[in-house]
Regions:
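Short alpha-beta junction capping motif
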Residues: 17, 76-116
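Active-site-proximal beta-strand/loop segments in catalytic clefts of secreted hydrolases
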Residues: 20-23, 67, 79-82, 101, ...
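Short, low-complexity, polar/charged sequence segments that are solvent-exposed and flexible
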Residues: 36-41, 96-99, 125-126, 151-154
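Loop/turn elements at helix/coil->beta-strand transitions in domains of secreted/extracellular proteins
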Residues: 13-15, 72-77, 100-105, 130-131, ...
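Aromatic-Pro/Gly-enriched surface loop or interdomain linker
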Residues: 1-76, 80-83
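An acidic, glycine-rich "communication" segment
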Residues: 28-29, 114-194
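Extracytoplasmic/secreted proteins, especially bacterial periplasmic and envelope-associated proteins
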Residues: 40-44, 48, 90, 94, ...
């Protein structure tokens, strides 16, 4: 487990990696798909962020339900494998309020048209008058820290080692980076699909 210096006096001002816990169809034992790679990937992200930036980064990631009022204390949240997410009405309202109050959610690691369709339907409940926008390679987000020459597709290590391909299923060969924006043009959700 990586460790780094952390000034606990500034714990509430530090960046803290927060994962969204949600209900889904399917999952892993008593945990849903939201639990994939937890807490290792969250800790790795936090460690690398403090290593590569001058940010004060909290060393203990956490997960929160969308209906937990603590979500408003964290401007960045992460959602993994949401292809079969199922939001309650209360979660839809909480997510919408989170975005209206300045929050941002990064969505990652879901594959294929069936998962996209279900995710899209759930997000249309949050954003009934908005459509996700496909982000072109020229978008600044692909050039902020590293100047990317192509949109990366990150496969599971098993697929890469077994088949030498960067997609996980036949209907997931094309990588998509999409986003939802608010009325002011602020990106509120980045969606990494395929």
């Amino acid at each position: 487990v990586p460790v780094w210096d952390f000034d606990k006096a500034f714990a509430t001002e530090a960046f803290r990696f927060v994962r969204v816990r949600y209900n889904s169809i399917g999952g892993y034992g008593p945990f849903g798909k939201w639990f994939t790679d937890y807490p290792d990937s969250d800790l790795n992200f936090s460690f690398r962020l403090q290593q590569l930036t001058t940010m004060n980064v909290h060393p203990e990631p956490l997960y929160l339900d969308l209906t937990d009022p603590k979500i408003f204390d964290y401007p960045f949240m992460y959602m993994i494998e949401p292809g079969f997410i199922w939001l309650s009405d209360a979660e839809v309202l909480a997510m919408r309020e989170y975005f209206e109050r300045g929050g941002f959610i990064m969505v990652d690691d879901f594959w294929g048209e069936e998962e996209w369709y279900n995710f899209y339907i759930q997000m249309k409940r949050v954003f009934p008058k908005r459509e996700p926008v496909d982000l072109p390679l020229e978008h600044p987000i692909f050039h902020l820290v590293y100047d990317l020459e192509k949109k990366p597709q990150v496969p599971s290590i098993h697929n890469w080692m077994r088949y030498g391909v960067t997609y996980e299923r036949p209907d997931a060969k094309e990588v998509h980076y999409r986003a939802f924006f608010d009325d002011g043009g602020r990106m509120v959700m980045m969606i990494c699909h395929n």
